[in-house]
Protein backbone atom coordinates (compact mmCIF):
# COMPACT_ATOMS: atom_id res chain seq x y z
CA UNK A 1 0.00 0.00 0.00
CA UNK A 2 1.44 3.37 -1.02
CA UNK A 3 2.38 6.14 1.37
CA UNK A 4 -0.56 8.57 1.37
CA UNK A 5 0.89 11.04 3.83
CA UNK A 6 1.20 14.65 2.75
CA UNK A 7 4.78 15.76 2.04
CA UNK A 8 5.61 19.33 3.04
CA UNK A 9 8.77 20.79 1.51
CA UNK A 10 10.79 22.81 4.00
CA UNK A 11 14.21 24.27 4.64
CA UNK A 12 16.05 25.43 7.72
CA UNK A 13 18.06 28.64 7.66
CA UNK A 14 20.54 30.17 10.08
CA UNK A 15 19.55 33.84 10.15
CA UNK A 16 21.67 36.88 11.05
CA UNK A 17 24.83 34.94 10.31
CA UNK A 18 26.98 34.27 7.27
CA UNK A 19 28.17 30.96 8.78
CA UNK A 20 26.27 27.74 9.33
CA UNK A 21 25.63 26.69 12.94
CA UNK A 22 25.49 30.29 14.13
CA UNK A 23 22.72 32.89 14.20
CA UNK A 24 19.05 32.08 14.81
CA UNK A 25 17.59 28.97 13.19
CA UNK A 26 14.33 29.19 11.25
CA UNK A 27 12.17 26.51 9.64
CA UNK A 28 10.47 27.64 6.41
CA UNK A 29 7.59 25.66 4.89
CA UNK A 30 7.14 26.51 1.23
CA UNK A 31 3.43 25.69 0.82
CA UNK A 32 1.16 25.88 3.85
CA UNK A 33 -2.08 25.85 1.87
CA UNK A 34 -4.61 23.46 3.39
CA UNK A 35 -3.01 23.49 6.83
CA UNK A 36 -5.22 24.56 9.72
CA UNK A 37 -4.08 26.90 12.47
CA UNK A 38 -3.77 23.84 14.73
CA UNK A 39 -1.62 22.08 12.10
CA UNK A 40 0.74 25.04 11.84
CA UNK A 41 1.05 25.38 15.61
CA UNK A 42 1.71 21.65 15.97
CA UNK A 43 4.38 21.71 13.26
CA UNK A 44 6.04 24.70 14.95
CA UNK A 45 6.16 22.73 18.21
CA UNK A 46 7.67 19.79 16.32
CA UNK A 47 10.37 22.03 14.83
CA UNK A 48 11.05 23.37 18.35
CA UNK A 49 12.80 26.51 17.07
CA UNK A 50 12.25 30.13 18.06
CA UNK A 51 9.96 30.49 15.03
CA UNK A 52 8.62 28.56 12.06
CA UNK A 53 7.10 30.21 8.98
CA UNK A 54 4.50 29.03 6.48
CA UNK A 55 4.37 30.49 2.97
CA UNK A 56 0.87 30.58 1.48
CA UNK A 57 1.23 30.89 -2.32
CA UNK A 58 -1.52 32.69 -4.23
CA UNK A 59 -2.17 34.32 -7.58
CA UNK A 60 0.92 36.09 -8.96
CA UNK A 61 -0.98 39.33 -9.56
CA UNK A 62 -2.09 39.42 -5.92
CA UNK A 63 1.46 38.70 -4.76
CA UNK A 64 2.79 41.57 -6.87
CA UNK A 65 0.25 43.93 -5.35
CA UNK A 66 0.13 42.77 -1.74
CA UNK A 67 3.24 40.65 -1.21
CA UNK A 68 3.77 36.96 -0.52
CA UNK A 69 1.54 35.78 2.33
CA UNK A 70 3.50 34.38 5.28
CA UNK A 71 2.45 33.34 8.78
CA UNK A 72 4.85 33.14 11.73
CA UNK A 73 4.55 30.75 14.70
CA UNK A 74 6.58 30.23 17.86
CA UNK A 75 6.22 26.96 19.77
CA UNK A 76 3.40 28.61 21.69
CA UNK A 77 1.60 31.18 19.53
CA UNK A 78 1.25 32.98 16.21
CA UNK A 79 3.05 36.33 15.94
CA UNK A 80 1.96 39.34 13.87
CA UNK A 81 5.60 40.12 13.09
CA UNK A 82 9.08 38.90 13.95
CA UNK A 83 12.37 39.98 12.45
CA UNK A 84 14.45 36.86 11.94
CA UNK A 85 11.54 34.88 10.38
CA UNK A 86 10.90 37.77 7.99
CA UNK A 87 14.52 37.97 6.89
CA UNK A 88 15.06 34.21 6.68
CA UNK A 89 11.85 33.61 4.74
CA UNK A 90 12.77 36.37 2.29
CA UNK A 91 16.16 34.72 1.74
CA UNK A 92 14.45 31.35 1.16
CA UNK A 93 12.04 32.89 -1.36
CA UNK A 94 14.83 34.75 -3.14
CA UNK A 95 16.86 31.57 -3.59
CA UNK A 96 19.39 31.94 -6.38
CA UNK A 97 17.27 34.41 -8.36
CA UNK A 98 19.28 37.49 -7.46
CA UNK A 99 16.06 39.45 -6.89
CA UNK A 100 16.68 42.87 -5.37
CA UNK A 101 13.48 42.86 -3.30
CA UNK A 102 11.03 40.37 -1.81
CA UNK A 103 7.86 41.73 -0.18
CA UNK A 104 6.05 39.67 2.45
CA UNK A 105 2.50 40.18 3.68
CA UNK A 106 2.51 39.35 7.37
CA UNK A 107 -0.31 39.72 9.88
CA UNK A 108 1.10 43.16 10.69
CA UNK A 109 1.04 44.22 7.02
CA UNK A 110 3.46 44.48 4.09
CA UNK A 111 7.17 44.20 4.90
CA UNK A 112 9.63 44.69 2.02
CA UNK A 113 13.08 43.09 2.22
CA UNK A 114 15.81 44.61 0.03
CA UNK A 115 19.00 42.77 -0.89
CA UNK A 116 22.52 44.09 -1.34
CA UNK A 117 25.07 42.10 -3.35
CA UNK A 118 28.58 43.42 -2.77
CA UNK A 119 31.64 41.83 -4.37
CA UNK A 120 33.41 39.40 -2.07
CA UNK A 121 30.63 39.43 0.53
CA UNK A 122 27.56 37.25 1.11
CA UNK A 123 24.22 38.88 0.22
CA UNK A 124 22.75 41.13 2.90
CA UNK A 125 19.00 41.41 3.30
CA UNK A 126 17.45 44.45 4.95
CA UNK A 127 13.81 44.75 5.98
CA UNK A 128 11.95 48.00 6.52
CA UNK A 129 9.87 47.80 9.67
CA UNK A 130 6.81 49.79 10.64
CA UNK A 131 7.63 53.25 11.98
CA UNK A 132 8.24 52.99 15.72
CA UNK A 133 5.87 53.90 18.50
CA UNK A 134 7.51 54.97 21.76
CA UNK A 135 5.12 53.75 24.44
CA UNK A 136 6.37 54.26 28.01
CA UNK A 137 9.57 54.90 29.93
CA UNK A 138 9.89 52.71 33.01
CA UNK A 139 10.87 53.32 36.61
CA UNK A 140 14.19 51.55 37.25
CA UNK A 141 13.24 50.54 40.78
CA UNK A 142 10.04 48.88 39.54
CA UNK A 143 11.91 47.00 36.80
CA UNK A 144 14.64 45.97 39.26
CA UNK A 145 12.06 44.59 41.67
CA UNK A 146 10.20 42.71 38.93
CA UNK A 147 13.25 41.20 37.23
CA UNK A 148 15.48 40.52 40.24
CA UNK A 149 18.26 42.65 38.73
CA UNK A 150 20.07 44.94 41.18
CA UNK A 151 19.24 48.59 40.53
CA UNK A 152 22.98 49.36 40.52
CA UNK A 153 23.35 47.22 37.39
CA UNK A 154 21.20 49.44 35.14
CA UNK A 155 22.70 52.08 32.86
CA UNK A 156 21.18 55.28 34.22
CA UNK A 157 22.34 57.47 31.31
CA UNK A 158 19.59 56.20 28.99
CA UNK A 159 15.97 55.21 29.74
CA UNK A 160 14.32 51.83 30.02
CA UNK A 161 11.69 52.24 27.32
CA UNK A 162 9.03 50.20 25.54
CA UNK A 163 9.17 50.66 21.77
CA UNK A 164 7.16 48.90 19.08
CA UNK A 165 7.73 48.40 15.36
CA UNK A 166 4.98 45.76 15.30
CA UNK A 167 5.77 43.95 18.55
CA UNK A 168 6.42 45.96 21.76
CA UNK A 169 9.80 45.34 23.40
CA UNK A 170 11.11 46.98 26.55
CA UNK A 171 14.67 48.04 25.75
CA UNK A 172 16.52 47.67 29.04
CA UNK A 173 20.06 49.11 29.19
CA UNK A 174 22.53 47.52 31.62
CA UNK A 175 25.87 48.89 32.81
CA UNK A 176 28.38 46.37 31.49
CA UNK A 177 29.15 43.21 29.58
CA UNK A 178 29.77 41.38 32.86
CA UNK A 179 26.29 42.28 34.11
CA UNK A 180 24.49 41.16 30.96
CA UNK A 181 26.53 37.96 30.58
CA UNK A 182 25.76 36.91 34.16
CA UNK A 183 22.10 37.91 33.98
CA UNK A 184 19.80 35.95 36.31
CA UNK A 185 16.24 36.89 35.43
CA UNK A 186 13.21 36.32 37.64
CA UNK A 187 11.14 34.97 34.76
CA UNK A 188 7.83 34.89 36.64
CA UNK A 189 8.25 38.42 37.99
CA UNK A 190 9.33 39.71 34.59
CA UNK A 191 6.34 38.10 32.85
CA UNK A 192 3.92 39.59 35.37
CA UNK A 193 5.43 43.05 34.97
CA UNK A 194 5.38 42.85 31.17
CA UNK A 195 1.73 41.79 31.14
CA UNK A 196 0.81 44.87 33.19
CA UNK A 197 2.85 47.22 31.00
CA UNK A 198 1.57 46.00 27.60
CA UNK A 199 5.04 44.87 26.52
CA UNK A 200 5.86 41.50 25.00
CA UNK A 201 9.47 40.96 26.13
CA UNK A 202 12.46 42.63 27.75
CA UNK A 203 15.40 43.27 25.41
CA UNK A 204 18.52 43.67 27.54
CA UNK A 205 21.34 45.71 26.02
CA UNK A 206 24.70 47.16 27.00
CA UNK A 207 27.08 49.46 25.16
CA UNK A 208 30.06 47.34 26.21
CA UNK A 209 30.54 44.70 23.49
CA UNK A 210 32.59 41.62 22.62
CA UNK A 211 33.14 42.71 19.01
CA UNK A 212 34.59 46.22 18.96
CA UNK A 213 32.60 46.86 15.76
CA UNK A 214 29.28 46.34 17.57
CA UNK A 215 27.32 49.23 19.05
CA UNK A 216 25.24 47.10 21.43
CA UNK A 217 25.50 43.67 23.03
CA UNK A 218 22.01 42.21 23.51
CA UNK A 219 20.16 39.30 25.11
CA UNK A 220 16.49 38.34 24.85
CA UNK A 221 15.17 35.84 27.41
CA UNK A 222 11.62 34.53 26.95
CA UNK A 223 9.29 31.59 27.60
CA UNK A 224 11.19 29.31 25.20
CA UNK A 225 14.54 30.05 26.83
CA UNK A 226 16.79 32.53 25.05
CA UNK A 227 16.67 33.88 21.51
CA UNK A 228 20.02 34.08 19.67
CA UNK A 229 18.88 36.91 17.37
CA UNK A 230 15.70 38.99 17.57
CA UNK A 231 15.17 41.20 14.54
CA UNK A 232 11.95 42.79 15.77
CA UNK A 233 13.61 43.75 19.06
CA UNK A 234 16.66 45.01 17.17
CA UNK A 235 14.39 47.35 15.19
CA UNK A 236 13.01 48.73 18.45
CA UNK A 237 16.58 49.12 19.72
CA UNK A 238 17.55 50.95 16.51
CA UNK A 239 14.76 53.48 17.09
CA UNK A 240 15.73 53.77 20.76
CA UNK A 241 19.41 54.35 19.86
CA UNK A 242 18.59 57.18 17.46
CA UNK A 243 16.11 58.74 19.90
CA UNK A 244 18.68 58.82 22.70
CA UNK A 245 21.90 59.56 20.83
CA UNK A 246 23.45 56.10 20.97
CA UNK A 247 23.45 56.05 17.15
CA UNK A 248 23.18 58.85 14.62
CA UNK A 249 20.27 59.08 12.16
CA UNK A 250 20.78 56.72 9.18
CA UNK A 251 24.01 55.35 10.70
CA UNK A 252 24.16 51.59 10.12
CA UNK A 253 25.36 49.95 13.33
CA UNK A 254 25.68 46.36 14.45
CA UNK A 255 24.01 44.64 17.40
CA UNK A 256 25.63 41.42 18.60
CA UNK A 257 23.40 38.80 20.20
CA UNK A 258 23.49 35.07 20.95
CA UNK A 259 27.10 35.11 22.19
CA UNK A 260 26.23 33.48 25.52
CA UNK A 261 24.40 30.69 23.66
CA UNK A 262 27.35 30.03 21.35
CA UNK A 263 25.08 31.13 18.47
CA UNK A 264 26.71 34.50 17.69
CA UNK A 265 24.52 36.74 15.56
CA UNK A 266 25.19 40.05 13.83
CA UNK A 267 22.19 42.31 13.28
CA UNK A 268 22.68 45.48 11.25
CA UNK A 269 20.26 48.31 12.03
CA UNK A 270 19.62 51.95 11.16
CA UNK A 271 16.82 54.48 11.49
CA UNK A 272 16.11 57.99 10.24
CA UNK A 273 15.03 61.09 12.16
CA UNK A 274 12.67 63.53 10.45
CA UNK A 275 10.30 66.18 11.79
CA UNK A 276 11.20 65.28 15.39
CA UNK A 277 10.26 61.64 14.80
CA UNK A 278 12.25 58.44 14.40
CA UNK A 279 11.16 56.79 11.14
CA UNK A 280 12.30 54.32 8.47
CA UNK A 281 13.65 51.62 10.76
CA UNK A 282 15.71 49.08 8.84
CA UNK A 283 17.06 45.77 10.12
CA UNK A 284 19.37 43.56 8.11
CA UNK A 285 21.79 40.69 8.09
CA UNK A 286 23.02 37.59 6.33
CA UNK A 287 21.37 34.14 6.22
CA UNK A 288 22.56 30.68 5.18
CA UNK A 289 20.58 27.54 4.36
CA UNK A 290 21.61 24.52 6.41
CA UNK A 291 18.87 21.87 5.97
CA UNK A 292 16.48 21.03 3.14
CA UNK A 293 13.90 18.26 3.27
CA UNK A 294 10.29 17.20 3.80
CA UNK A 295 7.91 16.78 6.69
CA UNK A 296 5.27 14.02 6.45
CA UNK A 297 1.75 14.52 7.76
Predicted regions and their residues:
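Active-site proximal loop and beta-alpha junction motif in alpha/beta enzyme cores
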Residues: 1-81, 87-297
Amino acid sequence: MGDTRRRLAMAQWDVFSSRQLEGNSLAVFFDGRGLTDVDMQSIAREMNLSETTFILPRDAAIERERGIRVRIFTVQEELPFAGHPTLGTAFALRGESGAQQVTLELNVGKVPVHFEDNAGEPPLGEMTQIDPTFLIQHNREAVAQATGISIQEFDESVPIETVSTGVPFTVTPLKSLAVIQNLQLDAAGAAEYLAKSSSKFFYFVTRETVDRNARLHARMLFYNGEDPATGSAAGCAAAWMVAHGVAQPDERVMIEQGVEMKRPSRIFVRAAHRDNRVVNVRVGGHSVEIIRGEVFL
